[in-house]
Amino acid sequence: MWMNFESLQIARAYLFGEVKYLDLMLVLNIIDIITGVIKAWKFKELRSRSAWFGYVRKMLSFLVVIVANAIDTIMDLNGVLTFATVLFYIANEGLSITENLAQIGVKIPAVITDRLHVIESDNDQKTEKDDQAAG
């Protein structure tokens, strides 16, 4: 079967723009899925339904990048919004992979785990403030 990769590149450029690190985001998504499955298998929590929803969430993150690219194009932001969105998802995947590896039993350097705790506590505080403001 012959595939026209030039057409794929055109579609990629149209949907995602010329954003950097999109390939890294894809690779980290795959690594996160693999480490998540290993973690779930280790703790005997491997469920096809919850895994399926996890995969859908991963795909939807690319949809968010497409929307960010559309907004970027309409507002003539030169790719800033799309780039920031991709960086957000890269950081999120990196954190998730690190958490999965730590729960599996892989030793993680203290600098990284300390930073994870700071980010996690910042997120918890923000969630509490949002809940108080809404309620």
Curated annotation (Swiss-Prot):
The principal location of this protein is host cell
What is a biological process (GO) this protein takes part in? Answer: killing of cells of another organism
Localization: Host membrane
Name the domain of life: Viruses
Q: Which UniProt keywords apply?
A: Cytolysis, Host cell lysis by virus, Host membrane, Membrane, Transmembrane, Transmembrane helix, Viral release from host cell
Q: Which GO terms describe its cellular component?
A: host cell membrane; membrane
Q: How does it sit in the membrane?
A: Multi-pass membrane protein
Is Transmembrane helix one of the keywords UniProt gives this record? yes
Q: Which chain regions cross the lipid bilayer?
A: 24-41, 62-84
General function of this protein: Produces a lesion in the cytoplasmic membrane allowing the phage lysosyme to attack the peptidoglycan.
- NCBIfam families xref list: holin_tox_secr (TIGR01593)
Which family is this protein grouped under?
A: Belongs to the bacteriophage holin family. Cp-1 holin subfamily.
Q: Tell me the protein's name.
A: Probable holin
Protein species of origin: Bacillus phage phi105
